[in-house]
Amino acid sequence: MKRSVELKKGWSLKRAGKTAESQEDGLAAAETTAARLRDWIRIKTMPAQVQDVLYEHGLLPEEFRLGWCEKALFIGESDWIYRCSFTGEKGRKCRILFQGLDTIADIYLNGIKLGRCEDFYLPAEFDITDLLERDNTLYLHFISPISYMKEQDWEEKWNGSVMRCKTVRKPIHDFPPEKTEKGSNYQGAVPYFTPVGVYGPVSLVYYEEEEIRDDFIQARAEADGNGVLSIEMRGTGRPDTLTVHWDFSGENGKEKGDKGGSKSFRPDVREDGWSIREEIEVDSPPLWWPRGFGEQNLAEINIEIRKNGKVCDHILKRIGFRRIQMEVPFAYHINGKKVRLFGGSLDPLQGYTHCYQPDRERRLFEMVENANINTLRIWGEGIPLPDEFYDECDKRGILIWQEFFLGHGAYPDSEKIRDFCKKEAEYLVRRLRHHPSLLLWCGGNENPNGG
């Protein structure tokens, strides 16, 4: 059966390449620091960006966390290498999945280059079935984003309308401010933070021939009080059956096991894989409501595919039956009831790291509820948030205004940037579309004329 193994241990970090003059200035306060950065530094917890690791080992001053970054500029101007030693199951089908690389990284496994990541907003995945050994070594060579930006193609027509940092698919506030007289970037760092490194989980995904590769699960609440569970899926191999289980005995609401059910289907199998598209009628499902209007009833959906009676792959998601209507701009009715939005705009919780911080996020949700907020805007110039953030919004009834990661005016009209943005949008929609808390999609922040 398909399973995922996160690589949390066995990681270390070192600086690579030549050091620019400004970088050495940043290290001048301690001669031993420069020497230590040429050696491997053990990473205690993953994911962790370079700034997280150096601070934890006492290689960055305390003032860095307060926003004074002069002594940390060398991080964004340097190349960095992550190394991970891990044990694998040789002979099994396996992919390696990176769910957060910041940003330009060449990836090597056992001396073989797997490829390069150049987009902060996209996961990277490689099939390593033929390379995986019992004992393995993974290297991630992160290229300086400052140097990479300066090397990108630039067209004269962009002068005056496009910021140069937009040739890199990374948050624009991670780069030096173009108007240096301001003294800091938008998020308050002086002069700026440039996070680099691994900000999301790295996992081995062991899989079978029969596999789920894409899914679209939608719960609709009809006007008559009944519900429809819509399922579209596709995958590889030749599974015999696909079985859908659903119940409402989750964390929120009262026990409603009598509303659950199960149904099996035979997928449409072709030479290039399989697919299925079905609708299941659900009698009077408990409805999902935004905070302050009712319970956040969630249905747990477990879908399995089998071959010769063996479960080969499955997905587990929580969904909510609700109906959203917008009769005029921003006049929303949910499940037939008028809902007034009380919102806040969510900025990244930290400037110096893009790693998700569950404790800080829980505190944020407490503040949101204390402020009587029922809607959060995910800022287009911010960073992607993991599934657990949206799961928490589902549980708490917090509606989401989701922006695509674009903002602050025009972008280069190059084929490379267009292709990245298209892939980002497709990935984000596929990942989030089943969440009942998702209220609307927005094209970005402050870029109607040039986005």
Mark where each language-model region is.
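Secreted/periplasmic carbohydrate-active enzymes, especially glycoside hydrolases
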Residues: 1-376, 395
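Substrate-binding cleft of carbohydrate-active enzyme catalytic domains
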Residues: 323-451
